[in-house]
Amino acid sequence: MIRNIFLSVILSISSFVFLLHASEKPSSLQNDLSQFLPEEKDIGEWKRDGSPQEYKGEDLFLYINGGAEIYHEYGFKQVIVQDFRNKNGKSISVEIFEMLDSESAYGIYTFKTSTEGKELSLGDIAQLEDYYMNLWKGNFLVTLTGFDEEEETVRGLQEIARAVEAKIKTKGKRPLLVSMLPEKDLVKPSIKYFEGNLGLYNNYPFFTQDVFSLKKGVKGDYKTGYSIFLFSYKNSEEGQNRFIDVKTSFKESQRYKDFNPVGDELFKVKDSKGKLIFVAHFKNYILIIMGKIDQSQVRDIFTNIQK
């Protein structure tokens, strides 16, 4: 009897310890960003310069003074920072951001890149601009910063980026909303994916307040001189209610003029610089087209984007 009780206790303790380690192991692996830092044998003459620094959650404000809000809007989890130096004194800083999901990482990637950069075949997508490089793969954004544009530094950026990318095994997928942008004449590096008003405001400040109640949105520029914004809502009712509020805000704002309804689901205004803005609603979306475009073209885009 006593022996059976003793064995039961031992088995219970063993099971508890096993479950404890089983639950801790995936979490530890998931949160250990140091596993993505490149080995020195894989990056030629570049060596680690100092110890890595890690910031999680709200601690990001300690690292990025005045710029952490946008990362949190997109869904920031944590970042690891490691500096590298070569024998000639050249320096490169590597930041590996873990975001909430693939869409979050793609969004912050589009926020940090521009039409001026050179696209590279790394990760899901990567861009090099001067001595600054961004790479998106899965739910990670990798940012590498050199401190000059010399060939040695630029080559180092790409060498280190390849080593980091090889360690990230997950792959990402662009948000479905991005695929709704018309392909014809789209300047692909101009695409911006939003997950809140701060990202939108930094791209074009329609209003200081979050009039659109934006959670998911996309924007693309077109070669013919106009831009398309598309915002997504949970359902048609929410989209309709938001459109009504947006319509009122444009109409009453001192920043816009020449408000003109064009049917029940479309109106146009001009901003303070005379730029023409068309705003429409369909299903659970709000569509904005602004720039050099006439009303007939807007109608065509409005029709095609609903297909």
Please identify what each model-predicted range represents.
Residues L20-K307:
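Soluble, non-membrane globular domain cores that form compact, hydrophobic packing
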Residues S8-V17:
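Bacterial N-terminal signal peptides
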Residues M1-I5:
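Positively charged n-region of N-terminal signal peptides that target proteins for export
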